[in-house]
Swiss-Prot record:
Protein name in the entry: Large ribosomal subunit protein bL27
HAMAP family (alphabetical): Ribosomal_bL27 (MF_00539)
Entry keyword set: Ribonucleoprotein, Ribosomal protein
A GO CC term attached to the entry: cytosolic large ribosomal subunit
Annotated disulfide bonds: none
A GO biological-process term: translation
InterPro entries, per database record: Ribosomal_bL27, Ribosomal_bL27_CS
MF term (GO), any: structural constituent of ribosome
Short name of any one Pfam family annotated for the protein: Ribosomal_L27
Name of the encoding gene: rpmA
């Protein structure tokens, strides 16, 4: 006969891989067209000017410039890219 009762297996021990969400380019940072600015689930940040919104709600730059975050009166944060000035004088 067994001297000890069989130990039950734990029901824990599983976890999903992190999805690496969040802001990738912060305010004032330079970006080029195609750079990912924010990875998100749903629209925590909303697209402004010169940015696109992917089917997974990724916000990406459409033109080269600097990233700008702006909170409007409705409480939503809008992400835009301010194009760089043309050739410096």
């Amino acid at each position: 006969m067994a001297h000890k009762k069989a130990g039950g297996s734990s029901r824990n021990g599983r976890d999903s891989q992190s999805k690496r969400l969040g802001v990738k380019k912060f305010g004032g940072e330079a970006v080029i067209a195609g750079n990912i600015i924010v990875r998100q689930r749903g629209t925590e940040w909303h697209p402004g000017s010169n940015v696109g919104l992917g089917k997974d709600h990724t916000i990406f730059a459409l033109t080269a410039g600097n990233v700008n975050y702006r909170t409007k009166a409705n409480g939503r944060v809008y992400v835009s890219v301010m194009p760089k000035a043309e050739a410096a004088e």
